[in-house]
Every structure is written in structure tokens, then in C-alpha cells.
Amino acid sequence: MGDGTVDQQKPSFFWQIADDGWPVLALAGLLTILLTIMFVPLGTFALGMFVWLSHILRVPSRTTPQSAAVIVAPADGRVTEITKVARTNEFDPQVTEALRITIRTSLSDVQLQMAPIEGRVTDNFAIPGLFGGYEDMTAARADNERREITLTQDDGLSVMVVQLGGKTARQLVCRHHVGRFLRRGTPLGMARLAGVVELFIPADCTPQIAVGQHVLAGETAIARLPSRGRRRSSG
């Protein structure tokens, strides 16, 4: 759109593939054809892999909460950590804490990530690094490649989504340029495949989920914003 607004996308059928899923699916399709020509049983196995990839790379049908006070999950997966951490913010030096919610996406989850709030992209940049495992999250946060995406509401509240690379998540994708406005639940990007997503929100938000819970991107309410007048930024 000319004003930089991206409307929430609603899939018209089950197998609509996310834009960032097509490169993977195209390669899988080509491999399926080649293996079928070479040896039919291998082609049958590859076809099964193709169907599986189609499932996890699709645009899912999700019902996004309407309340403006709700922050939704940015990714499908299991919540592995909810922790208050020290943060700095050049726009508000008084902010010293943020709530960090860590979500681990598996190879059986939908890979498409979605905007947790309605707001404008104010930061989107990649930080080069390694692609180590997630067994030691402290090391992974320090050493692994990551992409940081900050969304800021009209009232100044901001949240940050961090895509964390890993052994299988080697492509961290978010094609939204700075200044683009996203609605809550709008496709945000993808960590191909099965990465970790960390969401940083104001420390005075109220979590609506627990460690171990499985969440759905764009649908599960994972936190509630503080009352107007007490809101703080977490970017």
C-alpha cells in the first residue's frame, strides 16, 4: 500500500504457502521430481517430505484477539523461558528492565512468524554470528546470528522480536522495511527452519502464558499491556 500499511493476510485455502517458504518448497519439489525419475521409492519418500514442508511453510488461518491491550505470540512453539532482563533504550533512559519471552519452534510447527502488536517497524537489522545449538542459551544469545525487529505503537510503546539462528535455522528473514506499519497478526518473517524467537516487552506487562505452554503465532495472547499512563518501552 502507498501509506506503508500491510493488511493482515487471510489464507483462502489450506495450502497457501508463505512467501518466504517458497524457496525451500521449490527446492524440495525439484528434488522430489529428480528422485522419482531415478528411483520411485525415493521419490515417494521425497513426496512425503514435500507435503510435510507444505504444511509447516503455509500461511495458517488464525483468529487474532481484537483487544489493543493484548500482545500475541510472534511464533508457533513451546515457551521455554519467561524472564525479566536488563535493557537499555536510547529514547527512554529510565527503562532498565524488559520481560523476555523465549519460544522454541520445532520442525512440526508452522514456521511463519507474525507481528505481536500493531505498530510501525522502527528497526530491522541482522547481526552476523554462528549457528550453534540451543543447549546453552547464554552462549547462543551471545554468539549466534540473530535478527532484531522492533515494532513501535503510535503511543510510543515498543516491543522487539529477536530471531535467533541455530543448527537448522540458518536463514533469518524479515523483509519489512523501517517505517512500514503492521497490524497485529500480520506475517512478520521466518527463521528457516525451526529456530528460537525471543520477544522483549515492557517489564510491567502481565504474562498470560506459562513455561512449557505451546503457543500459536498471531493467535495466543501471551501478555497484557499495562494500563495507559504506565506504559514503557522495551526496545
Model-derived regions: residue spans:
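Contiguous, well-folded functional domains in the mature portion of proteins
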Residues: 1-235
